[in-house]
A protein has these predicted regions:
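Short amphipathic alpha-helices and their capping loops
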Residues: 1-25, 48-90, 109, 164-218
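His-Asp-centered acyl/peptidyl-transfer active-site segments
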Residues: 6, 24-31, 48, 59-60, ...
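Active-site-proximal acidic secondary-structure segment that organizes catalysis
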Residues: 5-6, 10-11, 86, 109-169, ...
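Amphipathic alpha-helical regulatory segments at dimerization interfaces
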Residues: 49-57, 98-102, 132, 193, ...
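Extended, hydrophobic beta-loop-alpha segments that form or line the acyl/peptidyl-thioester binding
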Residues: 58, 62, 143, 262-269, ...
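Generic structural signal for small/hydrophobic residues in well-ordered secondary structure
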Residues: 13-14, 47, 58, 113, ...
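A short, small/polar-residue-rich loop/turn motif at beta-strand boundaries
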Residues: 3-4, 40-56, 72-108, 227, ...
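Gly/Ser/Thr-rich phosphate-binding loops and adjoining beta-strand/alpha-helix segments
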Residues: 5-10, 27-46, 106-127, 209-273, ...
Length: 422
């Protein structure tokens, strides 16, 4: 590994970095990775130059950590493109598996990129990042820049030698500063009130469950009518809400109906930038946020409106709650409890454009890395509306969640979305 000799500066970690460095997510490998075969003419020197350009353009790829509270940013890249050769596909994949291992947080550099050459026109490319430095928006930005720098490199252009600014470092400084101002006090008051009203994060499952052995993940896929997406969009439009809030409301309403609990909650990952000027900064900004529904018989339209009103505030005041609570000396999170229910709409995955690197065609290689999160005590609702065959997929541990309760929840959620009585 090559490490720049000169540190640009030391400064505070962001709250997201603080959470990861304090042991949050330690039970999983915490990797974001993409492995793919590239067919065509690949210029290895151009790949090296392109990745150097990406790292110089985004300082989050050049950060290392002194402690959970202190980071340092280098002015040069922290690692170069690794190059290997292999005689067989099996050997190439075995080589890649050696680099898809968890990062040492006390080390320098939380990104790896490697190329394994099978022949002159076929290469296996692996890009591995720790989740501390990347979310979906960041990944897309990094890959777009990678393709652009590669195209420039094959035309003879070099990556810039000097970094104009360190955007993520500046963001971490701003975030820590704002927490000590009225901006921070406003968020502290909001999350204190949320905790007083709904309890600590994350919301628990409202039905009593008992583990009956080792976790056994199962999936249930329910086909939805061809016009399901149109129905969701129509309900969202009439409620003046979003399609996501509409399907989330369906899940919350089903929890309330099946459990009989007056107040129910779920979680969802929110891909938001919480401070002005952070829209284009690369780094981890996504956080899990709570969704709540209180007591009261309502029609679907009223339910969606209530949930939407609550999510506006939750998204606005979104922060890494465990880190913020530690700084504020507030108990906002139950660290030993998993979310009872999570909800997503048309979940995206980390991808790599089919022809992102000019002159090559990419084919994704599904690769399982031990240590992936399994959520043994979280019921996962995934609404898939983008394809030709809309469906609701639910993933759960069948040795923890009762099958009958899960089926009842699915049916109630579907009825909510498809109901004409809104």
């Amino acid at each position: 590994m090559t490490v720049g000799r000169t540190e640009v500066t030391r400064g505070p970690t962001s709250l997201a970095e603080m959470a990861r460095l304090s042991g949050e997510f330690a039970e999983r490998h915490n990797l974001v990775y993409c492995v793919l075969w590239l067919t065509g003419e690949l210029d290895i020197a151009a790949v090296r130059e392109a990745w150097r350009g990406v790292c110089l353009s985004h300082d989050v790829l050049r950060r290392a950590y002194v402690s959970p509270d202190e980071a340092c940013t280098y002015d040069d890249v922290l690692g170069e493109v690794e190059f290997y050769t292999a005689d067989t596909d099996t050997e190439a994949l075995k080589t890649v598996r050696q680099i898809t291992t968890p990062f040492d947080l006390a080390g320098v550099g939380l990104s790896r990129i490697a190329i394994v050459q099978r022949d002159e026109r076929r290469h296996l490319l692996a890009i591995v990042l720790d989740h501390i430095i990347v979310d979906e928006k960041t990944w897309n930005r990094l890959m777009a820049d990678f393709g652009e720098f590669y195209e420039r490199a094959i035309q003879g252009a070099s990556a810039p030698d000097k970094v104009e600014k360190n955007a993520y470092h500046d963001f971490a400084l701003l975030e820590r500063h704002e927490l000590s101002t009225a901006w921070g006090e406003e968020r502290r008051a909001f999350w204190r009130s949320q905790t007083d009203r709904f309890g600590t994060f994350p919301p628990p499952f409202p039905i009593a469950c008992e583990a009956k052995g080792e976790s056994r993940l199962t999936a249930v896929h329910h086909a939805l009518p061809a016009d399901a997406k149109a129905r969701v969009l129509d309900l969202a439009k009439r409620a003046r809400a979003t399609p996501f809030v509409t399907v989330a409301s369906a899940v919350l309403a089903s929890l309330q109906e099946v459990s009989g609990a007056p107040t129910v909650g779920a979680t969802t990952p929110f891909h938001g930038r919480v401070l002005p000027g952070t829209a284009d900064i690369a780094g981890l900004f996504v956080q899990m946020v709570p969704l709540q529904l209180t007591a009261g018989a309502r029609r679907p339209l009223e339910t969606v409106r209530e949930v939407f009103s609550h999510t506006l505030d939750v998204f606005e005041y979104n922060l890494p709650l465990r880190s913020a609570g530690r700084l504020w000396n507030e108990e906002l999170v139950s660290v030993d409890r998993q979310a009872g229910v999570s909800v997503t709409l048309d979940k995206r995955t980390m991808s790599f454009g089919e022809s992102l690197l000019v002159g090559t065609k990419a084919e994704i290689v599904p690769l399982y890395v031990p240590g992936e999160v399994t959520w043994p005590r979280t019921l996962q609702f995934m609404w898939e509306m983008d394809g030709m065959a809309p469906r609701l997929s639910v993933y759960y541990n069948e040795n923890y969640f009762p099958d009958e309760a899960v089926e009842s929840l699915i049916q109630a959620a579907e009825n909510f979305v498809l109901s004409t009585d809104s």
